Amino acid sequence: FTGASASVKGYPHSSIFAMGKHGLRGLASAMGRELAPQGVHVCHFVIDGGVRNALKGRTEGPDDPSDKYLCPDAIAETYMHVVGQDRSSWSWEIELRPYGENY
């Protein structure tokens, strides 16, 4: 499951979005406990920042670092790492944020 910062903290003027993302996190938690006995690994990913794309990949000047956004390839590598985890050390939740993101 893919969540957002709002999965774990609320922001002003985003109550509806936070409600949905908190609900998604709860669903992932319940499904993880329900499906683990059958060998199904459920993980919730918190994407805490913007994802670089064709528009966001450009820098706007010397004060705009390229590490301001998450790299799609790095996100995919993290997902694939979780898919390949041994059952003895499954991750339940992974938070991903770019170096330049405040938290």
Which sequence ranges carry the predicted segments?
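Catalytic loop of short-chain dehydrogenase/reductase
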Residues: 1-23, 28-29, 33-36
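C-terminal helical subdomain
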Residues: 37-52, 58-103
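Short beta->alpha connector loops of Rossmann-like oxidoreductase domains
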Residues: 10, 52-53
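Short acidic, glycine/proline-rich loop/turn micro-motifs
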Residues: 12-14, 56-59
